[in-house]
Structure formats: C-alpha cells, structure tokens
Amino acid sequence: RLISAAENHPEVYAKVSDEIEKKAAANKAPVLGITGTGGSGKSSMVDELIRRFLIDQPDKTIGVISVDPSKRKTGGALLGDRIRMNSIRGERIYMRSLATRQSNLALSKHVQKAVDILKAAGFDLIVLETSGIGQSDTEILDHSDVSLYIMTPEFGAATQLEKIDMLDFADVVAV
C-alpha cells in the first residue's frame, strides 16, 4: 500500500516518507539492478536468481521491483514480467510491478521510493528489474549497488558493442 501511495497519493506518502527514509538508510541490504534489451531474458534471469536465493538462503527475504514500459499510444502497461517468474510465491518473497508511466523510459519515477519502502520493510536483498533499454541507458546505476546487464548473442556487428553504455558500467554481463 505504501508503494501505491508513493505512486498515486504523494500527499499521503509525504506523511510517512521521513520515517521510511530513516529505516531504509539503516538497512544495508544490497540492491541488484538488472537491465538489458527487451526480450533478452531479464525476467527469466530474475526468476532463476530468486529460486536459487530461496534455496541457498533459507532464512533470508527478497523483495523484487519489476518495471514494465507504458505504451505511448494508450498509456497502459502490460506488467507481464511476473508471467516468467515461477518462484515469486511464498512468505519470504515480495514482488511488485511498476509501470514507467511514460514512454521511452526504463524505470518509473517512483522506483527509488519503492526501493526505500522495501529496505524499510527489512528485506535482505532487493532486485530491481528495468524494462527493456536502448544503447545509451544507464539509469539503473543510480538505484542499485550491483548492476547486471543481460544481452542476447545476436547483437549485430561487433561495432554495436561499442555503442552499449551499460557494457562500460555493468558489474556483471550475462549473454
């Protein structure tokens, strides 16, 4: 409900934002930012990471924020990332989809508030998945401690790799 308040009712969220920010600052949970081109397998990778995390860390919790693009023509968003995620059920996981609410963006303008809310709630790991990005988008770096760039092997000519900014900044690249 707090994430919805941050998105839709800023006046309500403003009443609790200071407390949330204090609690979020006290939680040193890492934020894993996952980004890549549309259709590269970001949601499938998130699902696999969640599955392994839940097995390997039986006492830990994970919060997932998944951002999907809003269509320019209709303003709507499919929020379909969860279709690929089979491991998002259970008491130790929370998954929330957000729409970019604008075209040509990889993240929602409310994503940092959502991350802070999950940190304040005490999650041990937070995964932030962007919608598909273009060659010059590195916005995920502003919201994550560790960044993972996912790409397909069909990237075109080798010179295309030189144009992908995330290859210069990502902590991990998965093909």
PLM region descriptions:
Residues 43:
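Walker A/P-loop
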Residues 146-151, 166-175:
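Conserved beta-strand/loop subsegment of P-loop NTPase cores
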